[in-house]
Amino acid sequence: MRLTDRFRDPETARAVAAAIRAKSTRPVQLMEFCGGHTHAILRFGIPTLLPASVDLRSGPGCPVCVTSAGDLDRAIAMAQVPKVILTTFGDMIRVPGSRTSLAQAKAGGADIRVVYSPLDALQVARQNPDRPVVFLGVGFETTAPMVASAVLTAEAENLDNFTVFSTHKLTPPATLAILDAGEVALDGVIGPGHVITVIGADAWRFLPE
């Protein structure tokens, strides 16, 4: 039996849902931060198991969604510089900036390439030593270490044609900004566990405090 099988047992799920309904005596609003949580909650039909008093809200956990139009405009401008190769994740290609998108810039002649990791971008730099290669880095704390590793590798290999345009965001300030705005009254936050394994739980201690 796989460890995850116990979490997908129908009887266990029904028992947990019944316990939640029994304890739910007032309206509660919960926000999940991570886009992976949003996907899993919808995929497994969690909202249908919860009482109407429990309202699940999706937070800013999508790297694409939190990348500003201004940052995209700058990335597009870099890609349009002669000889520059811009590399990034496929999710970013069709995201609009203020005037155009990376896909449209690519169609217009810019050398924009989809990679699956910053290490792939490093390989592009190795293969094109006479051209500047820029990696558009997006995401939160979980994607930053791999980008940092690529930078250290480039330094060790003296790849002076490799640079990173980092648009990484920190998850605790993003959550704090939502709470401070006062527009959404939250009773709890389902925090991003994978982020906490990188930065530690102390960064999120402001929530219970």
Where do the protein language model's features map onto the residues?
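Conserved anion/nucleotide-ligand pocket segment
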Residues: F206-E209
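Metallocofactor- and cofactor-centric catalytic cores in central/energy metabolism, strongly enriched
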Residues: M1-D130, A144, A148, L152, ...
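Phosphate/pyrophosphate-binding betaalpha-module
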Residues: L136, F140-A203
